[in-house]
Each structure stands twice: as structure tokens, then as C-alpha cells.
Swiss-Prot record:
Its main location: membrane. PROSITE patterns: ATPASE_C (PS00605). The chain crosses the membrane at residues 10-30, 52-72. It is a multi-pass membrane protein. InterPro entries: ATP_synth_csu_bac/chlpt, ATP_synth_F0_csu, ATP_synth_F0_csu_DDCD_BS, ATP_synth_F0_csu_sf, ATPase_proteolipid_c-like_dom, F/V-ATP_Csub_sf. This is ATP synthase subunit c. The gene is atpE.
Amino acid sequence: METILGMTAIAVALLIGMGALGTAIGFGLLGGKFLEGAARQPEMAPMLQVKMFIVAGLLDAVTMIGVGIALYMLFTNPLGAML
């Protein structure tokens, strides 16, 4: 039982940590490309900004789904029935 709980805790930590890391990298790339596009064509900056916010919302949504799955694994422990 302790092994399953320990492995579940490690899986939850990896899921949340990798989700946060992926989101940070994604936001960095997204912001950099937005600034690059706005510097090249300043007249398109408002349109690019709207698209950037839509993609940023989707990027956050993927991370929140991962956090939800991690919390589900942590508190319900679906692997406990294997014992």
C-alpha cells in the first residue's frame, strides 16, 4: 500500500511540475513571437494581441486539466483497488 501511495505522490508531483514547466516555456515562446510580430508589423498588433490571448487561455486550460487529473489521482487514489 505504501508503494502505491508513494508512486502516486511522485506521479502527481511530476504531472504538476511538468505542466508548469511546459506552460512557462509556452508563454515565453508565445510572448516572444507576439513581440516579434508586433515589431515587424505594428498595424497588426491589435489583431495579434487578440490571438495571443486566445492561445494563452488555451495554454492555461491544458495546465488546469493536468492539475485536475493530478488532484483526482491524489485524493481518490484509483490504484488503491489493485490491492
